[in-house]
């Protein structure tokens, strides 16, 4: 007797949560797209930045800065979130740079650290070769060969043949919208909403 209303109420909650999540990721993709209007030079230099809500100079940046700036437009400070998680779980993060403690200036600007953070926050999704699995607002990470990694955000726009979503990223030509989803080896696929 009470079971049916309970199931209906539960389904309504699930639909509401899924819908709210899709709205967030649509807004995330829209926010990322606005970054392509800014003139930004690729600059991998180490910068001392404020904390929290620190950023490198607005006319400079790398691939991770696209993700960081996009989430910041949505009110999410990845610098703070990554730093706080690394401070508690430092041993779970990559040891590629030989550091013995966190660094608020750079930790959030490293692709392997962002990948670890998104995995820890249960944002990891399957890596596939199917373009339809990559939805607007998703985060994609690639290996460019050797130890070089890259990251970008799935846009809400499609390739000319309408088969693949475009990517907003910075691989050297500034913050651009490009058809490059499967150009490199995909090593991470994430959907993160705090």
Label the predicted regions:
Residues 33, 37, 68-76, 83, ...:
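Sec-exported extracytoplasmic/periplasmic mature domains
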Residues 19-61:
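Active-site-adjacent structural segments surrounding the nucleophilic cysteine of cysteine proteases
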Residues 24-29, 87-168:
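...with weaker cross-activation on analogous glycine-rich loops/strands in unrelated enzymes
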Residues 10-19:
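Hydrophobic h-region of N-terminal signal peptides that target proteins for export
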Residues 3-10:
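Sec-dependent signal peptide recognition
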Residues 162-194:
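Low-complexity, Gly/Ser/Thr/Pro-rich intrinsically disordered linker/tail segments
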Residues 44-64, 77-101:
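Acidic helix-start/capping segments at beta-turn-to-alpha-helix junctions
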Residues 49-58, 100-104, 125-128, 173-178:
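Second-shell loop/turn segments in exported
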């Amino acid at each position: 007797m009470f079971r049916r209303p309970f199931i209906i109420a539960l389904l309504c909650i699930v639909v509401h949560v899924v819908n709210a999540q899709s709205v967030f990721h649509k807004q995330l993709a829209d926010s990322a797209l606005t970054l392509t209007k800014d003139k930004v030079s690729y600059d991998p230099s180490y910068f001392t930045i404020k904390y929290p809500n620190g950023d490198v100079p607005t006319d400079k940046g790398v691939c991770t800065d696209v993700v960081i700036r996009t989430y910041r437009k949505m009110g999410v400070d990845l610098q703070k979130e990554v730093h706080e998680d690394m401070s508690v779980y430092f041993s779970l993060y990559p040891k590629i740079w030989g550091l013995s403690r966190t660094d608020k200036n750079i930790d959030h600007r490293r692709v392997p650290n962002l990948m670890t953070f998104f995995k820890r926050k249960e944002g990891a999704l399957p890596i596939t070769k199917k373009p339809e699995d990559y939805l607007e607002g998703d985060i994609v990470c690639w290996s460019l060969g050797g130890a070089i990694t890259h990251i970008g955000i799935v846009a809400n726009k499609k390739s000319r043949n309408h088969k693949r979503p475009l990517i907003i990223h910075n691989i050297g030509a500034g913050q651009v919208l490009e058809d490059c989803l499967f150009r490199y080896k995909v090593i991470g696929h994430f959907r993160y909403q705090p």
